[in-house]
Amino acid sequence: MKAKGSVFRYGDNVDTDVIIPARFLNTSDPLELAAHCMEDIDADFSSKVNAGDIIVADDNFGCGSSREHAPISIKASGVSCVIANSFARIFYRNAINIGLPILECPEAVAVIEAGDEVEVDFDSGVITDVTKGQSFQGQAFPEFMQTLIAAGGLVNYINATEK
C-alpha cells in the first residue's frame, strides 16, 4: 500500500483540541468533522487539503484528550497519513483503529518541509521526499496492523471477517 501527496507541516505538541476543537464534538459525521479539522492551528486547512495529502509534525502529535474524533477528522479530510517524530500513545491506537496510517521517522521529519511532495510505502516503511530526492526508512507496520489499515480500521476488519 502506498500514498503520495503534498505536505502540511506542523510543530510539537499538536493536541487533539487543535486537530478537532471540542466545540465540534457534537457530531460524529466524518465529513462535518473534516470541515473543521486543524482549523484552530491552520484556518484554511479544510479548503487547501486534497485527497492523498500528508501531515508531517514534530514531537507528541495527537496529545491531549482521548478523542477518536481527531484521527477521524484527519482521515475524512483526505489526508493519507501522518508522519511525526512521535505520537501520543492513545492517538496512535485511535488512528490505527480507524484506519489512518501513521509513521514515526525523525530523520524524514527533520528534512521534509511544507509543500514537499512525499511518497510513503507502508509495506516497507520507506518515506520518499520526491521534491528533495531523499528517502528515509520509517518503521513499517506489522502485517496485522497493515491488514487493519487496509480494511479501513478495526470495525471494518471485524465486520469483514465475521461474514
Curated annotation (Swiss-Prot):
Name of a matching Pfam family: Aconitase_C
EC nos? 4.2.1.85
Pathway(s): Cofactor degradation; nicotinate degradation; propanoate and pyruvate from 6-hydroxynicotinate: step 7/8
Q: How does activity depend on pH?
A: Highly active between pH 6.5 and 9.0. Retains 50% and 10% of maximum activity at pH 5.0 and 4.5 respectively.
Tell me which InterPro entries the record gives: Aconitase/3IPM_dehydase_swvl, AconitaseA/IPMdHydase_ssu_swvl, IPMI_Swivel, LeuD, LeuD/DmdB_bac, LeuD_type2/HacB/DmdB
* MF term (GO), any: dimethylmaleate hydratase activity
Catalytic function, reaction form: (2R,3S)-2,3-dimethylmalate = dimethylmaleate + H2O
GO BP field: L-leucine biosynthetic process; nicotinate catabolic process
Induction is noted as: By nicotinic acid.
The UniProt entry, under Gene3D superfamilies, shows:
Aconitase, domain 4
Q: Which protein family is it in?
A: Belongs to the LeuD family. LeuD type 2 subfamily.
Q: How does it assemble?
A: Heterodimer of a large and a small subunit.
Q: What is this protein called?
A: 2,3-dimethylmalate dehydratase small subunit
The species this protein belongs to is Eubacterium barkeri (Clostridium barkeri)
Gene for this chain: DmdB
